[in-house]
Curated annotation (Swiss-Prot):
Assembly and oligomerization: COPII is composed of at least five proteins: the Sec23/24 complex, the Sec13/31 complex and Sar1. Interacts with SAR1A.
GO biological process terms held by the UniProt record: COPII-coated vesicle cargo loading; intracellular protein transport
Gene it is expressed from: SEC23B
Native source species: Homo sapiens (Human)
Protein name stated in the entry: Protein transport protein Sec23B
Presence of keyword Protein transport: yes
Function statement: Component of the coat protein complex II (COPII) which promotes the formation of transport vesicles from the endoplasmic reticulum (ER). The coat has two main functions, the physical deformation of the endoplasmic reticulum membrane into vesicles and the selection of cargo molecules for their transport to the Golgi complex.
MF terms (GO), sorted A to Z: GTPase activator activity; zinc ion binding
Compartments it resides in: Cytoplasmic vesicle, COPII-coated vesicle membrane; Endoplasmic reticulum membrane; Cytoplasm, Cytosol
Tissues expressed in: Ubiquitously expressed.
Consequence of substituting R497C: In CDAN2; uncertain significance
Domain of life of the native organism: Eukaryota
Alphabetical list of Gene3D superfamilies matching this protein: beta-sandwich domain of Sec23/24, Sec23/Sec24 helical domain, Severin, von Willebrand factor, type A domain, Zn-finger domain of Sec23/24
Gelsolin-like repeats: 634-720
Effect noted on mutating D239G: In CDAN2; uncertain significance; the mutant protein is expressed as the wild-type
Length: 767
């Protein structure tokens, strides 16, 4: 029989699902006492090369309030050609096409190995993909040139029938006509005035009939492909013209006097982009790709004035309620994000500048629509260029790794209710019998819209056990959950992916050990971290840390083995032993600690944490540290100051940064040039090994991490020193002068002190 670890891994590979608990407590009361909620990490479009989509539509339950999809958990009467829904127990007739089914001739959706299955919807017209570039022209010359080259390169990566459009902005906003005649025309809008969707569509001529003979018919925006085709054209038609147009783009002509910022109308440019797509291609897969090199400084959505002597808001300003533009700007971008999400479009933000660009205010545009957020120092860096190129990578079938306009519908058996979701989604406000009144994350619904997603996009979905304590579930009973994702594939097909899972119920009184053994501490850590980060958006930082600490203490009290008032007796079983250290590193992470990070950086880190899969999320919480030495092959070592030794090279992966750190002796040898001497060939190989491994990570990761190569005493060694557990500090005098690692100059508590304190509180009867 497979161990729980193997079971968890198999389910993740097959269904893209990781649950916090893999055996479920059978009553509401007991579930609340488990501390960590029953929840899962769902990767709706996890890549499955072994799962070709079936070319027919799913069979649905006939009950209007259910509409669950036929799945391997349903009871089937092959003689009568009936099936019973495992969620509402409705008996349903099979459609005529299923007339030949039997125990030995089952359709794929009834086979246990197809707990996840994908259907291709044949009906309905297919729509092309749409890419609308919104480009800031208030950039330095070399930055603008690099961005233009990246955009020109991207045209060659788009499908030939994809529609593409261009909006540029500085003090004014220009919507470019993309005709094939080679004449450059554009509509110019003032950057200080907000316009309604109707005004934008009227000004661009999107609501007028395309030809005089159509005057008699009332005009509908999406009825006039001619009108929209002036601004959105197939790549194969305007490839050359658009390449030339991009090449001719100039810096914003408005002069910028000394001591002033350029006037940048980002808010109006985005508003026009949203209005253009809203009027021409609602409910069609589209990406608005915003490229900005500085903060919005005028019009709706401005986050700072044009006076350089007045800096952009900091965390200190926000805490003192001294960020005068923040609330109004955030409201503007939230309104745009909600309109974009309602139309099934997504917004990407590519912000490259040395100072902040307003990501804090604009974050909802990417967070609510499933768009990408990329932050860098300049468009003229490999970090931006390679990250941007990676957006257009293709899968094993030659299709883009992106999907559009998805809706996620969650169905549960009657003992469960849905509390909410945390991830790149918005609520569709679909109430129903399986929706809980207690909200965790975005709740009050059983359906969410995810306008942009890729094979790693992951949502945290939280549930509530509602079965009462006095109505026991029969022995061997199983709870079931179905995830139904409707989406537009990058090949423009409409598809439906259905994942149906079941887990055993267990009585906590008699089967607590089973429930304990089925605890997935990695998934639980990420799910609790998502809750913490979600709370951090609206609560004070110390309050969130206190909440996380309380949950950890309660969990240790519930599942630890100990004698009252005796911290030395405290033990956690293997399935819980790593959880406290995940929480220790989470408390120190940039998701919850804003010290030393700008508001934009915090928004960027939190954006990625809310959408990455389990493996990447764990790296973000607790970075991975590898050691390279002459003593053997590279090996993972503790993320601890004791691992920083003079004769070692360390490679640290934090997801956002890849840090190579040379120990003191290694750094001296490199300085002396030993690697260039033939007799020290092995030293040359030692120096090269972490570089090769770092390159491998850099090639695979999206967004591309920042690459830092440093050494003992180097200024950038701080990236490593700030992440490791400070087990040796300037206060541990006994460690000085010994080969026990590097002392860290910090007042932060170490993991050992944290654990000692946790044990003390867990065994205390006062808690």
């Amino acid at each position: 029989m497979a161990t729980y670890l193997e079971f968890i891994q198999q389910n993740e590979e097959r269904d893209g699902v990781r649950f916090s608990w893999n055996v479920w407590p059978s009553s509401r009361l007991e579930a609340t006492r488990m501390v960590v909620p029953l929840a899962c990490l769902l990767t709706p479009l996890k890549e499955r090369p072994d799962l070709p989509p079936v070319q027919y539509e799913p069979v649905l339950c006939s009950r209007p309030t259910c509409k669950a999809v036929l799945n391997p958990l349903c009871q089937v009467d092959y003689r009568a050609k009936l099936w019973a829904c495992n969620f509402c127990f409705q008996r349903n007739q099979f459609p005529p096409a299923y007339g030949g089914i039997s125990e030995v001739n089952q359709p794929a959706e009834l086979m246990p190995q197809f707990s996840t299955i994908e259907y291709v919807i044949q009906r309905g017209a297919q729509s092309p993909l749409i890419f609308l570039y919104v480009v800031d022209t208030c950039l330095e010359e070399d930055d603008l040139q690099a961005l233009k080259e990246s955009l020109q390169m991207s045209l060659s990566l788009l499908p030939p029938d994809a529609l593409v459009g261009l909006i540029t902005f500085g003090r004014m906003v220009q919507v470019h006509e993309l005709s094939c005649e080679g004449i450059s025309k554009s509509y110019v809008f003032r950057g200080t005035k907000d316009l309604t969707a109707k005004q934008i569509q009227d000004m661009l001529g999107l609501t007028k009939p395309a030809m005089p003979m159509q005057q008699a018919r009332p005009a509908q925006p999406q009825e006039h492909p001619f009108a929209s085709s002036r601004f959105l054209q197939p790549v194969h038609k305007i490839d050359m013209n658009l390449t030339d147009l991009l090449g001719e783009l100039q810096r914003d002509p408005w002069p910028v006097t000394q001591g002033k910022r350029p006037l940048r109308s980002t808010g109006v440019a985005l508003s026009i982009a949203v209005g253009l797509l809203e009027g021409t291609f609602p409910n069609t897969g589209a990406r608005i790709m915003l490229f900005t090199g500085g903060p919005p400084t005028q019009g709706p959505g401005m986050v700072v004035g044009d006076e350089l002597k007045i800096p952009i808001r900091s965390w200190h300003d926000i805490e003192k309620d001294n960020a005068r533009f923040m609330k109004k700007a955030t409201k503007h971008y939230e309104m745009l994000a909600n309109r974009t999400a309602a139309n099934g479009h997504c917004i990407d933000i590519y912000a490259c500048a040395l100072d902040q660009t307003g990501l804090l205010e604009m974050k909802c545009c990417a967070n609510l629509t499933g768009g990408y957020m990329v932050m860098g120092d300049s468009f003229n860096t490999s970090l931006f260029k390679q990250t941007f190129q990676r957006i257009f990578t293709k899968d094993f079938n030659g299709d883009f790794r992106m999907a559009f306009g998805a809706t996620l519908d969650v169905k549960t058996s009657r003992e469960l209710k849905i509390a909410g979701a945390i991830g790149p989604c918005v609520s569709l406000n679909v109430k129903g019998p399986c929706v809980s009144e207690n909200e965790l994350g975005v709740g009050g619904t059983s359906q969410w819209k995810i306008c942009g997603l890729d094979p790693t996009s992951t949502l945290g979905i939280y549930f509530e056990v509602v079965n009462q304590h006095n109505t026991p579930i029969p022995q061997g009973g199983r709870g079931a959950i179905q995830f139904v994702t409707h989406y537009q594939h990058s090949s423009t097909q409409r598809r439906i992916r259905v994942t149906t899972i079941a887990r055993n119920w267990a009585d906590v009184q008699s089967q607590l050990r089973h429930i304990e053994a089925a605890f997935d501490q990695e998934a639980a850590a990420v799910l609790m971290a998502r809750l913490g980060v979600f709370r951090a958006e609206s609560e004070e930082g110390p309050d969130v840390l206190r909440w996380l600490d309380r949950q950890l203490i309660r969990l240790c009290q519930k599942f630890g083995q100990y004698n009252k008032e005796d911290p030395t007796s405290f033990r956690l079983s293997d399935s819980f032993s790593l959880y406290p250290q995940f929480m220790f590193h989470l408390r120190r992470s940039p998701f919850l600690q804003v010290f030393n990070n700008s508001p934009d950086e915090s928004s960027y880190y939190r954006h990625h944490f809310a959408r990455q899969d389990l493996t990447q999320s764990l790296i973000m919480i607790q970075p991975i540290l590898y050691s390279y030495s002459f003593h053997g092959p590279p090996e993972p070592v503790l993320l601890d100051s004791s691992s920083i030794l003079a004769d070692r090279i360390l490679l640290m992966d934090t997801f956002f940064q890849i840090v190579i750190y040379l120990g003191e002796t290694i750094a001296q040898w490199r300085k002396a040039g030993y690697q260039d001497m033939p007799e020290y060939e092995n030293f040359k190989h030692l120096l090269q090994a972490p570089l090769d491994d770092a390159q491998e990570i850099l090639q695979a990761r999206f967004p591309m991490p920042r690459y830092i190569n440093t050494e003992h005493g180097g200024s950038q060694a701080r990236f490593l020193l700030s992440k490791v557990n400070p087990s040796q500090t300037h206060n541990n005098l006994y460690a000085w002068g010994q080969e026990t690692g590097a002392p860290i100059l910090t007042d932060d508590v170490s993991l050992q002190v944290f654990m000692d304190h946790l044990k003390k509180l867990a065994v205390s009867s006062a808690c």
